[in-house]
């Protein structure tokens, strides 16, 4: 399942997010979206988790949780 993670602190790195998500199971990929010109985080990203049950648990427990001083939004990503 592909998961959207929003309202991230701009200092959060992919490794930081990976560490949080690994508490709920393995993740295939973690990608924080960055501005093409500046290379700075846009404050959101995506996590791909192969186990849907683990992904649903992460969504249920982490949505609206405080992380690095911000209340994050986490939900199933919508297709483009």
Task: Cite the ranges covered by each PLM segment.
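Conserved nucleotide-binding/hydrolysis micro-motifs of P-loop NTPases
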Residues: 78-80
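Canonical RRM/RBD RNA-binding surface and closely related RRM-like beta-sheet modules
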Residues: 1-76
């Amino acid at each position: 399942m592909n998961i959207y993670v929003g309202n991230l602190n701009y200092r959060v790195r992919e490794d930081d997010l990976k560490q949080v998500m690994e508490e709920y199971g393995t993740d295939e990929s973690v990608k924080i979206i960055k501005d093409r010109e500046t290379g700075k985080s846009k404050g959101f990203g995506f996590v791909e988790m192969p186990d849907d049950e683990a992904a649903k648990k992460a969504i249920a427990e982490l949505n609206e949780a405080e992380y690095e001083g911000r209340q994050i939004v986490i939900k199933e990503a919508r297709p483009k």
